[in-house]
Amino acid sequence: MDIPLRTHATTTRDRPAVLRYSRTWDAGVSSIAEARDAVADLLARARPAPERRSVQDAQLVVSELVTNAAKHAPGPCALGLEVLPGARALRVIVTDTSREPPRRRPPDPRRVGGHGLHLVAMLARDLEVTWPAHGKRVTVTVPLTPRATG
């Protein structure tokens, strides 16, 4: 299921539009690149616009979480993105079919792979794992720094 990038709420003086994105994949590597592109597209519409480093951090977090879902869970995975009010943070929700909680492996600079959750922990906050009827949902919040103006 593909829900295109769009504004879901009406802009009023008291409440700005909420930017959201959601997508479900059957899994696979192509979903990772699409997820990174979705982050960039969504944040390009955020106001105030986040600085480039914040966009890259958000793309890395999403890439790691979607990679974990595609690698460790059989079946489809879903991605939800929501720019929080004032464009100060991006909420990221990744859902997959595995009931296994994500696990951080002990750091080992000689190991290839297995560093994704460490990166997520460095760049995001409020990591929460819940178990809906089928699988799990991982939610994090990535802080966004507004781009300097002038």
Residue ranges and their predicted role:
Residues 1, 14-16, 30, 34, ...:
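Polar low-complexity intrinsically disordered regions
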Residues 1-26, 70-150:
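Conserved beta-strand-loop-beta-strand hairpin that lines the nucleotide-binding pocket
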Residues 17-37, 41:
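Short beta-to-alpha transition helix within the HATPase_c
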Residues 37-63:
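Conserved short strand/loop->alpha-helix "switch" segment adjacent to the catalytic nucleotide/phosphoryl-transfer site
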Residues 61, 66-72:
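Short, well-structured hydrophobic secondary-structure segments
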